């Protein structure tokens, strides 16, 4: 689901149908790009179809939609505690009814996990929106649920800014942290304990959430050959 509750799957199916029916769009499925030469305005690209046939395409622009996926992480006890999951996993559990928000008393979310650092210097641009979306969904099902979001910067654009305000109005608590003072997660008597510096109170605070939700970076799929053909980087 999206921030406003729409189904991306339904939208995607409609979009695919429109592309298939468009008279000026030619679609190649199961096709591999083998070579590309030229410059902006004058490209010549060779593709290999599923039948093994080579076809040369003349075009003026190249848009590389390489795609991405949630990066792996071992931070904050992920993979060791069932109470530590990712935003994508939380969304799946909520969508398919595997998690009942009314059974929870508190949920903590940590943004920029393994992101905007030496390993992944970029911002994925979607993590904050996902956190807001899931936080608002949780609050809609359980208004008394305490939701805390630890963040470095809230990166939402355009109309999504309204959902940041809406989350605050719903009672979601936002706690900012610096890269050199990240939240610390330990376990005491089988419960998660989060210790973090509150910049407003100027002291450490502790939380014991029922669930900890992480936002690891979006990383590119392995498209090294395609990137080499077009001379582009995959980490930007």
Residue spans for each PLM region:
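Rossmann-like dinucleotide/flavin-binding elements
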Residues: 9, 36, 51-56, 65-157, ...
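Conserved nucleotide-cofactor-binding alpha/beta core module
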Residues: 1-15
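A Rossmann-like FAD-binding core segment of flavoenzymes
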Residues: 11-66, 132-222
């Amino acid at each position: 689901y999206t921030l406003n509750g729409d189904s991306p799957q339904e939208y995607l199916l409609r979009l695919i149908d429109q592309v298939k029916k468009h008279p000026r769009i030619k679609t190649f499925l199961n096709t591999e790009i083998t070579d590309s030469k030229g410059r902006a305005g004058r490209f010549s690209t060779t593709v290999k179809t599923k039948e093994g046939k080579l076809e040369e395409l003349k075009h003026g622009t190249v848009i590389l939609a390489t795609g991405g996926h949630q990066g792996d992480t071992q931070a904050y006890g992920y993979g060791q505690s069932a109470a530590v999951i990712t935003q994508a996993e939380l969304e799946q559990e909520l969508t398919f009814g595997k998690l009942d928000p009314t059974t929870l008393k508190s949920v903590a979310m940590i943004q920029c996990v393994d992101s905007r650092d030496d390993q992944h210097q970029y911002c994925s641009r979607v993590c904050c929106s996902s956190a807001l979306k899931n936080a608002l969904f949780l609050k809609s099902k359980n208004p008394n649920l305490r939701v805390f979001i630890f963040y470095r910067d809230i990166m939402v654009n355009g109309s999504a800014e309204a959902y940041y305000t809406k989350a605050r109005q719903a009672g979601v608590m936002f706690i900012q942290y610096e890269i050199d003072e990240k939240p610390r997660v330990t376990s005491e008597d089988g419960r998660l304990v989060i210790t973090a510096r509150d910049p407003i109170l100027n002291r450490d605070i502790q939380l014991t959430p029922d669930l900890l939700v992480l936002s690891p970076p979006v990383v590119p799929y392995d498209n090294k050959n395609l990137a080499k053909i077009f001379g582009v980087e995959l980490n930007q």
